[in-house]
Regions:
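Charged/polar low-complexity intrinsically disordered segments
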Residues: 2-3, 20
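Sec-dependent N-terminal signal peptides
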Residues: 4-16
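Acidic, contiguous N-terminal accessory segments
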Residues: 11-12, 19-105, 152-163
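Hydrophobic alpha-helical segments
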Residues: 16-17, 22, 66, 133, ...
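Feature activates predominantly on carbohydrate-active enzymes
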Residues: 39, 47-50, 54, 93-313
């Protein structure tokens, strides 16, 4: 009988715990504060501002920001595990072991609401998850006109203790433009894609059209055979021997002679050197020069796909 009674009481307790809600805003009144702990960076500030901005758009109420926890308000912590003054509940500490890459931990209990990430980029993702899941916010297209923000007087979160990790580390699509729209990277970030930038906590992504970086045009004067044969003449990648800069880097007018083993050897050595100089780079993109002028020497022609050669390409 006692065992049955205990089981029943325990079940009721668990149901009540699962049904617990922690209001950030109630009837249009702010009941929570964002606590900015010591040791934070621009990313923590930005993530907190995003939460504050969109909760205000939803409810009309402004979450306060503080340097220390409030005794009256529900405290919100957006931080990395090493933030000074952060006191994680035991359950949150245990779950933190499961966080990887730019994933995040969401924990909500009587102690407060915690958005914790090992990589700062994950802090933004954690905030956006809260706004999407409990605020119904959606960012459909870049810019204010492309966002959907429901209006209501309340904003609450249930009891939370979960880890959200990405399925794969790098998530993005490249917008091919020399002058990308400023709002587009933010829109991508809000939709879970990886972005560079100090506010986004992005990693270092290097490379691009770098053949002319890996094979400097300065070598043209002594080794023209490394460079592309175009209309019967070997040319540097800048297109004109008279325009070779002091460093000889950055030309994009044509491609080098990629059938020459020495060309490949030099490019390989310079690539390894670049990688060693940037050990923290998350990705390194290696693209040909931004030009359709390929080497027309006999050996390079042999590398052309037959269908393109037949079309004179």
């Amino acid at each position: 009988m006692q065992k049955t009674l205990f089981s029943a009481l325990f079940s009721v307790f668990m149901l009540l715990l699962g049904a617990a809600e922690y209001p950030l805003v109630k009837d249009g009144k702010s009941l929570a504060a964002i606590v900015r702990l010591r040791g934070g960076t621009a990313v923590e500030i930005f993530a907190g501002s995003e939460l504050q901005t969109y909760v205000e758009k939803i409810t009309g109420a402004t979450l306060s920001k503080r340097r220390s926890p409030s005794a009256e308000l529900y405290n919100i912590y957006i931080a990395t595990p090493d933030a000074r003054g952060l006191k994680l509940p035991d359950k949150a500490k245990e779950l933190l072991k499961e966080v990887r890459d730019d994933g995040f931990l969401l924990y909500a209990g009587g102690e407060g609401l915690y958005v914790i990430a090992r990589e700062r980029r994950g802090l933004n993702y954690g905030v956006y998850e809260l706004l999407k899941r409990y605020g119904g916010v959606r960012w459909i297209t870049p810019g204010p006109e492309g966002e959907f923000v429901p209006r209501k007087k309340d904003f609450s979160v249930p009891a939370l203790a979960e880890v959200v990790n990405p399925s794969f580390r790098h998530r993005n699509f490249n917008l091919v433009s020399a002058h990308g729209a400023k709002l587009t990277p933010l829109w991508q970030m809000r939709n879970g894609m990886t972005q560079n930038g100090p506010l986004y906590g992005g990693g270092k992504h290097l490379g691009g059209h770098i053949f002319s970086t890996l094979l400097p045009d300065a070598l043209y004067r002594t080794n023209p055979e490394l460079f592309g044969l175009y209309k019967g003449k070997r040319l540097p990648q800048c297109g004109d021997p008279a325009k070779i800069t002091k460093t000889g880097i950055g030309g994009q007018a044509n491609q080098p002679c990629t059938s020459n083993p020495e060309t490949i050897r030099i490019m390989q050595e310079n690539l390894v050197r670049l990688l060693r100089k940037n050990p923290g780079a998350e990705s390194f993109c290696i693209l040909n020069n931004d030009s359709t002028a390929w080497c027309e020497c006999e050996n390079c022609r042999k590398l052309d796909p037959p269908e393109e050669a037949a079309r004179g390409m």
